[in-house]
């Protein structure tokens, strides 16, 4: 029952249309107009009180009352509404900043009552306090907290840890960046607790806090057959819903923990789930759900057209109002900038290109010279951000090494003079940036719920009610949709994407075949084609769900080669896995007693076990592994693993640049068709291929090659850590490599001291530096 159509019908009333246009475009209302529109708002609030499903009625009334406060400086209606619906932080802010000229005795009494909602140096909303209390006191094993972005999910996590202090606790997060941020936050609150963020840091503790991605959680379970988490907190739980591999293994990690401990408590936190049944993993699973349906923030939406006209959009009336004209998108962004500006694009290459173009129009800031020197000294003098950061701009995308990405994120958060962040979807998963205005330059593949999540990052609540603010303008964040053919594509007007925001209700799209309520019947019933031999009988695993059941319910049995391969998702690289599995099983038995095998390095072992003679099966689904047929490729990756652990970032980049120079000097064909991946590719690998995955290094300047080397380094590091590591884990599980070989691949050393330092949280590069 959205109600948006009922509101749109009021457009036919001229005074109503005129007043809404004024409120949308920031024009003060006359006394008669105020009286009329506030009366209309009261009617909508009364209808909402009759039926709480009519959330759009409340949202519209709140929009009007908030705008009246911000434009006409008439705060009494907002004060009264906030008191009635429990938006108590607004009441406290209005009272402390004296935004109402004279408070009645009743208002003073109400402020004293509001103080009862003080929690950890801030005032909570009524629903926020109620939900937090009920979630924490819940005896249910499965608890779901659904609330808009920045509505206290982090503080709820800390509370869950406090009431389970001496237990085994794990927070499951979707990205390595969130691991880093979570560790920093947890260390501040729980300085004496051991925090595990790598599966190898566990040392048989009875009580700990861990922060894992789903991949690390499963590796933790694989290495510790009996361990379980008493409490599992799944952050950004909407990541269970899509049809992708990471969603499937997230479901696997949750189910495995519950299988190992039937009394484990699970908490699911998300701003984007519509109803908890979408998360259902088992038929008997019952959720205790608490949800905040009302959003205290009401964004303003702007659209810049490529010809220069710009408009303001009212989502309730589905109307756009022309505001003016600007010469180009760069001038438009500069005209609408605030202290912290976030520009969103999709492609890593476009992220860099836009950063370059905007920086040409920005002036130098001498205060940032020292930061620029840090990047130059520790990364490379030709890294684009060395120049850009001096103008108050940084960019982020998946091709930047994690260490540098973490550093840049931290500096954007803490350094006031860095005003521009240009990035893609790497920021979608919970990173708490201090963003004051959002410019969206591309909406390709940006689903409506991800768009809402992105918008929710602007003006987090702790920034809205900061004592540094003199008003409540941050309750009304600015979101700009900026059209440009180069950055968004031809004939892709963002107006149509913006119109989707007029609704307040969005159904869950449950596509993960491991979930019970998946809507994707085709995937749900798709035959995996895997046969399992158990108790001398052959059993066909026909669906993804059956495959997951096989992995979960056989959890405590000895690891077979088959199960280990499936756990690592290596079965999916082969076209006919059943035939391949029989050959792999024979190789395992043969290599266990082979002197030839013992003399191979670990990369050669990967080749001889998983790749050799499987060209037909690999070329259909996993062509990237066929290059290991070449001895030089295997030699390259053997050396790369060593450099990855022992060289600094700067040394490694210089090594790659020397490699590029060598390719050029020796006229190697690879120099003019170098594989860099789809994100930065400009030409296809072979004629007729539609995918541009290669570059011609001979056409690139020294500076361009240095930045491509950075991407190259990140790509290769990810390939080792995600693709080759799966092979290494399997070989180790089935005892085809020694612990020393495993340690050298993972830690870069056989020395126990180095391994212990790594388990304490130090990187292999830092360990090498400290021991140099």
Where are these regions (language model features)?
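N-terminal helicase ATP-binding lobe
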Residues: 1-772
């Amino acid at each position: 029952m959205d109600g948006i159509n009922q509101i749109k019908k009021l457009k036919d009333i001229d005074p109503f249309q005129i007043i809404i246009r004024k409120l949308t475009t920031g024009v003060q209302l006359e006394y008669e107009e105020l009286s009329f529109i506030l009366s209309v708002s009261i009617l909508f609030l009364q209808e909402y009180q009759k039926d709480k499903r009519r959330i759009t009625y409340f949202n519209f009334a709140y929009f009007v009352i908030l705008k009246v406060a911000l434009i006409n400086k008439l705060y009494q209606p907002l004060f009264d509404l906030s008191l009635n619906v429990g938006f108590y932080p607004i009441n406290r802010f209005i009272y402390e900043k004296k935004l109402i000229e004279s408070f009645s005795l009743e208002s003073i009494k109400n402020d004293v009552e509001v103080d009862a909602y003080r929690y950890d140096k801030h005032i909570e909303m009524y629903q926020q306090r109620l939900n937090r209390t009920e979630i924490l006191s819940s005896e249910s094993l499965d608890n779901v907290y659904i609330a808009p972005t920045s509505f206290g999910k982090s503080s709820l996590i800390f509370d869950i840890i406090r009431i389970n202090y001496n237990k085994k606790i794990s927070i499951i997060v979707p990205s390595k960046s969130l691991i880093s941020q979570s560790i920093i936050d947890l260390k501040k609150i729980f300085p004496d607790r051991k925090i595990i963020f790598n599966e190898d840091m566990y040392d048989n503790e009875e009580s700990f806090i861990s922060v894992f991605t789903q991949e690390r959680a499963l590796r933790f379970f694989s290495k510790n057959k009996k361990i379980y988490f008493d409490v599992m907190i799944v952050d950004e739980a909407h990541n269970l819903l899509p049809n992708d591999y990471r969603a499937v293994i997230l479901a696997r990690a949750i189910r495995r923990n519950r299988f190992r401990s039937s009394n484990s408590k699970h908490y699911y936190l998300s701003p984007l789930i519509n109803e908890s049944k979408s998360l259902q993993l088992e038929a008997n699973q019952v959720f205790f759900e608490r949800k905040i349906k009302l959003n205290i923030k009401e964004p303003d939406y702007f659209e810049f057209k490529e010809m220069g006209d710009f408009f303001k959009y009212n989502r309730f009336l589905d109307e756009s109002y022309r505001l003016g004209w600007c010469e180009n998108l760069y001038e438009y962004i500069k005209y609408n900038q605030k202290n912290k500006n976030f520009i969103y694009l999709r492609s890593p290459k476009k992220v860099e290109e836009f950063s370059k173009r905007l920086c040409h129009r920005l002036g130098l800031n001498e205060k940032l010279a020292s930061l620029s020197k840090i990047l130059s000294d520790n990364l490379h003098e030709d890294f684009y951000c060395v120049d850009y950061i001096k103008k108050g701009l940084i960019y982020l995308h998946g091709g930047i090494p994690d260490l540098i990405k973490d550093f840049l994120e931290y500096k954007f958060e803490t350094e006031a003079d860095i005003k521009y962040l240009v990035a893609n979807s790497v920021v979608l998963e919970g990173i708490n940036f201090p963003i004051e205005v959002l410019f969206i330059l591309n909406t390709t593949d940006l689903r409506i719920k991800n768009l809402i999540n992105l918008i929710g990052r602007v003006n987090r609540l702790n920034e809205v009610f900061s004592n540094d603010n003199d008003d409540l303008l941050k309750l009304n964040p600015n979101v700009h949709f900026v059209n440009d053919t180069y950055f968004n594509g031809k004939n892709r007007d963002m107006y149509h994407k913006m119109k989707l925001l007029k609704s307040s209700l969005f159904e869950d799209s449950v596509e993960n075949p491991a979930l019970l309520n998946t809507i994707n019947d085709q995937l749900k019933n798709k035959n995996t084609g895997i046969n399992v031999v158990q108790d001398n009988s052959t059993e066909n695993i026909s669906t993804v769900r059956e495959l997951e059941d096989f992995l979960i319910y056989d959890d405590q049995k000895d690891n077979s080669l088959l199960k280990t391969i499936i756990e690592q998702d290596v079965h999916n690289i082969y076209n006919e896995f059943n035939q391949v599995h029989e050959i792999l099983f024979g190789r395992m038995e043969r290599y266990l007693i082979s002197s030839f095998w013992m003399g191979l390095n670990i990369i050669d072992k990967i080749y001889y076990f998983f790749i050799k003679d499987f060209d037909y099966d690999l070329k259909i689904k996993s062509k990237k592994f066929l290059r290991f047929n070449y001895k030089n490729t295997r030699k390259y990756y053997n050396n790369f693993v060593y450099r990855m652990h022992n060289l600094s970032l700067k040394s490694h980049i210089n090594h790659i640049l020397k490699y590029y120079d060598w390719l050029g000097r020796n006229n190697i064909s690879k120099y003019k068709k170098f594989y860099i991946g789809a994100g930065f590719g400009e030409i296809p690998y072979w004629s007729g291929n539609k995918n541009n995955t290669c570059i011609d290094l001979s056409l690139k300047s020294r500076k361009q090659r240095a930045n491509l080397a950075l991407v190259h380094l990140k790509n290769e590091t990810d390939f080792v850590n995600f693709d080759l590591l799966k092979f290494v884990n399997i070989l180790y599980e089935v005892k085809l490599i020694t612990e020393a070989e495993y340690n050298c691949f993972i830690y870069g050393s056989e020395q126990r001291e180095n391994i212990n330092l790594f388990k304490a949280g130090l990187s292999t590069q830092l360990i090498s530096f400290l021991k140099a």
